[in-house]
Amino acid sequence: MGFMKNFFSQTRKPEGLLGKFMLGMMNYGHAKLADWGMGHLSEITPKEIIELGCGAGRDAGELLKRYPDARLTAIDYSPLSVEKAAEYNKAMIGSGRCKVQQGDVSDLQFEENSYDLATAFETIYFWPGLERCFAQVAKILKQGGYFLICNESDGKDAAGKKFENIIDGMICYTPRQIEDELKRAGFSEITTDHHPKKPWITILARK
């Protein structure tokens, strides 16, 4: 259990050799979920995007492809994730369309009302207090801006419960729990979609 716990705990804050391996797996393993989640953005044309908990950078790259006129800021509190995400999106960084930096979702150091879209793929499990973090997201979104959350766990599936027991600090939230915290943080027009065959959930909230 010691090795397994250490390995899967890399999903929370990747570091070292195991973290590098995990980040590579996450880019591949989360791709289908992220693409499904992005499919819920068909009516949105953001110019300024922030990705929260960017991991190794694959989803940031896909968002930049989806929105060729947008600029994106990607943050993660893992220095290794920031390094790998910057490598993955090197060309976009060079063109001036992408920035990757270390950041803390509980204390977002960005101008208020500056983003049209915020995304969080497979990350809120580890956020230190949803209402506080969601309020930080609301603060930096423009009025009418959107917040997209995508999770592989709906808070009730067996796999999610298993990983909660392995990874310290991981919480798999139900859609209702997420919706309630979003409302408390000031979001409205909250739409939840549950995958028909998997425990995946996508929640899209508007400020």
Role assignments for model-derived ranges:
Residues 2-6, 15-27, 146-204:
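C-terminal alpha-helical "lid/dimerization" subdomain adjacent to the S-adenosyl-L-methionine
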Residues 12:
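S-adenosyl-L-methionine
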Residues 27-47:
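Conserved alpha-helix/loop element of class I SAM-dependent methyltransferases that forms part
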Residues 48-107:
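Class I SAM-dependent methyltransferase SAM/SAH-binding core
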Residues 106-117:
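A short acidic, Gly/Pro-enriched loop at the edge of an enzyme's catalytic core
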Residues 117-130:
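A short SAM/SAH-binding and catalytic strip from SAM-dependent methyltransferases
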Residues 131-143:
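A short glycine-rich, Lys/Arg-flanked "PGG" loop and its adjoining helix->strand segment in the class I
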